[in-house]
Amino acid sequence: MRNLKQTAIALATLLNTTACGITPTATLMTLPTSAGDHSYTLQAAAAGQGKTSGANRWMTQPAQGVRTQFRTFYSQAARSEVSYHLYVPAAYEQQRRQRFPVLYWLHGTGAGTSAIPFLTEQIDQAIRAGKLPPMLVVFPNGQDISMWSNSKDGKTPMETVVVKELVPHLDRTFRTQAQREGRLLEGMSMGGYGAARLGFEHSQTFGAISMLGAGPLDLAFQGPKAEANPALREGVLSVTFGNDMAYYQKLSPWRTAERQARHLRGRLKLRMLIGERDFTLADNEAFRQHLSKLGLRHEYRTVPGVGHKLEGLVTALGDEYWTFFRNALNAR
């Protein structure tokens, strides 16, 4: 294995690119702050948008998005202020006695906040057109390579921060539908991995899971991306999993699905979307077959002409993209 300095330099190079090919744009709104939560008004899109703020990995730079706020809360687990972004639909202000479902959207490796401008614009348009029920959308800060998991060394308790602290914080601070049926999970790439892992492990908290180009899903962590970028694989294994393949496998969606299968059968709402040109296609196909063998029903769709790109998946499916969320919420 290369030395840590070389790995760090290679990781910095890999992660210093624009994720998903999305250019940040859009507008902003603000809401009054609540106790324990801090809201900030955003100005022009900041250079370095989506990167962590200084030495504090738990804080990102503010990103702009349609009807989007940059907010923070104090995490006991992280012993730090932690940032997140929040999309708030117009109906939240107009219907003050109503409670709203919440979509937790998990970003990919090194992607930070780069998807927020595109996604909030698409979500806002879908809600205004009646294609998607009004909902809050939370964009947690998953750092660069957390895998949305608690790191083995305890320094990055990401799963605890998101599930045990951020979710209750949102329920205290906003008029949410504070039960599993009112909470949705979606993520791209590392975020798809995280959506599956957290959704399977905490099925009492989340009612529906949407995986987009999810990975890594193989138990050996030897997929095409890992082979093409060995420094990234080494960094993830070292920083998050303590170079312990047994720990990596224990936390994997593959093993988590096996452990939780009896709790998930009959109540799991799961969608898998994958571009036909996505390098994770083979691993997603294998994972789909694994879920079927476990008796876990799910939607699975490959999208022609699309690679490992969020924007490509959403654009290619058009209005159909929102059907999964509508059905998940209407089935309650």
Please tell me what each predicted stretch does:
Residues M1-A8:
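Bacterial N-terminal signal peptides that target proteins for export
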Residues A10-T18:
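Bacterial N-terminal signal peptides
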Residues G21-R332:
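Non-catalytic cap/lid and distal C-terminal segments of serine-dependent acyl enzymes
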